[in-house]
Amino acid sequence: MNQDISICVLTENEMGWTEPFELDKVQILDNYYLSAQKSDIAFLKKMDTARLLAGFRTTAGIDTKGVRPYGGWEDSLLGGHCVGHYLTALAQAVKVTGDKELKEKSQTLIAGLEECQKKLGTGFLFGA
């Protein structure tokens, strides 16, 4: 059996090296990408910080008040893993948009993680 495969070999950029830039210096003008950004922000706003913190709180011995973690990875031995990705997404979205609700979510999440870290007393965080 034969199969054709295409390979793309990247060569050095004709413009030379690119320079780093701040996210808030980028302006999205294309409607497709603006729509994608709005969808991403709406998704970030739907995430429940209490559910994201539930595994960390359980591990630290802090009452979750009946709140359960999200399913999938968050309800397994990888629990808490997604929180780092979520914090990165929040930080980037706040940098780009200045959205106060997302900034508040990030502050709530960080405060919750700090509470768990202090309760454990080891400096360690574990969300599973």
Which residues does each predicted region cover?
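Glycan-recognition and catalytic cores of secretory/periplasmic carbohydrate-active enzymes
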Residues: 1-128
